[in-house]
């Protein structure tokens, strides 16, 4: 049975069990029990998480909402774009290094929309993820495009997390992409 690891924030934690159900015929899906928060937290935590998880055949990861936040009202992102880009590159490299798999297939999931603002920041950070994916030979799972056309039906009252319909839509696309990669058709 193939092993898939999913890493990411609370959005990942919402859809991971459903992805596991959808791929149960070909893979075991696992991930850390904790929230990956921002990219720097995820990068630092790889050394703690990876030894406790199965050796992966494929990893999907995402970070973004925490990175672009301004929780301290400083008028800046928590992780500015240049630091975010550098950290996302490092996540890709460290995943391959720590697993001992220099050709480990990686999928980078884009940040989902929220019901706050105009999404300019989300689009900017997702563009960074696309650039990193191209430079690191990773596949992009565009979750933003799945949720964005139906924000009202897919995002909860908290304006961030997914509704059951959002979870299902994101899990369906994620499972399709991961299945295709495992079967060599993506």
Residue ranges and their predicted role:
Residues 22-28, 43-186:
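Alpha-helical cap/lid subdomain in secreted, periplasmic
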Residues 1-17, 68:
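Catalytic nucleophile-elbow at a beta strand-turn-alpha helix junction centered on a G-D-S/GDSL motif
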Residues 6, 34, 62:
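Short glycine/serine/threonine-biased micro-segments
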Residues 13-14, 37, 124:
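Short alpha-helical
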Residues 9, 34, 160:
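Conserved donor-binding loops in enzymes that form glycosidic bonds
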Residues 6-8, 31, 110:
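Active-site neighborhood of phospho(di)ester-bond hydrolases with catalytic His/Asp-centered motifs
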Residues 31-38:
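Short beta->alpha junction loops
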């Amino acid at each position: 049975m193939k092993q898939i690891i999913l890493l990411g924030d609370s959005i990942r934690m919402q859809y991971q069990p459903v992805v596991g159900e959808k791929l149960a015929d070909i893979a075991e899906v696992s991930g850390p029990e904790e929230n990956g928060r921002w990219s720097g937290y995820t990068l630092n935590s790889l050394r703690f998480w990876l030894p406790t998880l199965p050796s992966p055949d494929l990893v999907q990861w995402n970070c973004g909402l925490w990175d672009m936040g301004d929780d301290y009202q400083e008028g800046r992102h928590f992780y500015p774009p240049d630091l975010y880009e550098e950290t996302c590159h490092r996540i890709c490299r460290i995943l391959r290094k720590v697993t001992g798999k220099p050709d480990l297939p990686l999928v980078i999931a884009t940040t989902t929309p929220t019901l706050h603002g105009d999404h300019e920041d989300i689009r900017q950070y997702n563009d960074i993820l696309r650039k990193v994916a191209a430079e690191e030979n990773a596949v992009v799972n565009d979750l933003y495009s799945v949720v964005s056309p139906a924000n009202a039906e897919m995002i909860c009252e908290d304006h961030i997390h997914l509704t059951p319909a959002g979870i299902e839509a994101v899990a369906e696309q994620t499972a399709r992409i991961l299945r295709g990669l495992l079967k060599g058709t993506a």
